[in-house]
Amino acid sequence: MTDGTQRRSVGSLPEPNAASSRVPAALTRFVWAMWLGTLAVVAGFVRTDPAWAVDGLVAIDGLTVVMWSVVTFFSGIVHSYSRRYLDGNPNKTQFFVRIFAFTIVVMVVVAADHIALFAAAWLAMGLLMAELIGHVDGWPQARAAARSARRYFVGGSLLVAFSLTLLWSATGATSVTGILDAVGGLSTTTALLAAGGLVVAAMIQSALIPFHTWVLSSMTAPTPASALMHAGFVNAGGVLLVRFAPVVTVEPTVMLAIVAIGAASALGGKLLKSVQPDIKGQLGCSTVGQMGFMLMQAGLGFFPAAIAHLILHGFYKAYQFLSSGGAVEHTTPQSVSDHTVGFNGVGSIIVTLATGLLGGALFAVLTGKGTLANGGILLTFFVTFATLHAARSAVKHTTLPATLRYGAVPLVFFPAIIVYGAAYEAISFLLADLPVVTATTELTLLHGAIAVVFVGTYLAIETGVHEESGRLYVALLNLSQPVADTLLTTTEDYNEY
């Protein structure tokens, strides 16, 4: 270097404290033990269908045991990964205490029956996630990201508290179960206001448009925290709607609005992802889109499908974040394979269409959805559409010879649909004790319009129509920008962390 620029050198790693170094290992083992315990709880629940509750305080039902097993499993993975990832970090013990506390709080959220306990746990969940986002407190950008997220989460918590207070004042019940039992007596105004507050709170939690900025500004979080956020924290929006399904299903207008909101975020997330230059930004926008799909399923009244979606998405996104380092490589560009032919030719089209249509039919047979003129048709349609998209991507990008490619696509996707259908049926069975498991919605012209707009916009994106507009590109780029104070633009800022 001849320009006189001084670069700070990276100092030696701090010596780990013997006592504190035992905390991460102990908490990791304890979380895995908790997961084994939750599996025993699930088994006991299936065998005896017990009424486990502390009257007016907590109530353990099918949703509780499902989410307990999922949350502790994801948390165990994150704990195990973090032991290696944070080696040498002076705040390693603090990080482990936070993710363990976060795990416990989420478990309280899905078990809480008293409305005050539910609201307090919901707030604590958001505050702990904000602390994880700002874990590297030596970065001004991390502190700014934590402040931004905290504002969103507190706002969502206030909406939850507002809805619960409104429901308490209307029903006189201080427990969630008591409120849900009395939903039938709510006035239209009360039902709309309470449901509206819960829906917006779910949108904030799940980072749906226009509340997606917090998740795109959270890239300062350590990778394990990002995995926990995208695989678990954002899912709480769906859990909120499932828990209070009797409230949000009272008015058909609310359910239709949920479908429209979900469709907008599903498409918006895909558009925003198309302009992201980095892997974490792409994963963040992918989460926005996937949570939109999850909300659509809830809006159609298929709450087990929403839970199945968020669980499977959690597995996928945890893997993607924890392996994101593998996407950053310096390699010599390779010549394009002769077998990378793209999506052209009659064979590609036939295989893609056949896989999508047969996949949708397989889902309908496995679940019984799509055989009647109700929201099940749209659910099956979106499953078919998702299968078409996945099959098209596989046919387009694979480097296998044509014969193997066309034969492998259905062999890969049909088992995946069977897994999804089996997960849907298993979760439906476990959620059978909830007040509302499935709220069949009658199809309307608006549902049809949403489907048409969804397909049209998707096709426009896939064919690259949106890339021809410079204004649209700039608009998408602006819409996907994180808060300015959260951007890490100087590599020297990383040196001491």
Region roles according to the model:
Residues 2-477, 481-497:
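...captures the hydrophobic TM-helix bundle architecture rather than a specific catalytic motif
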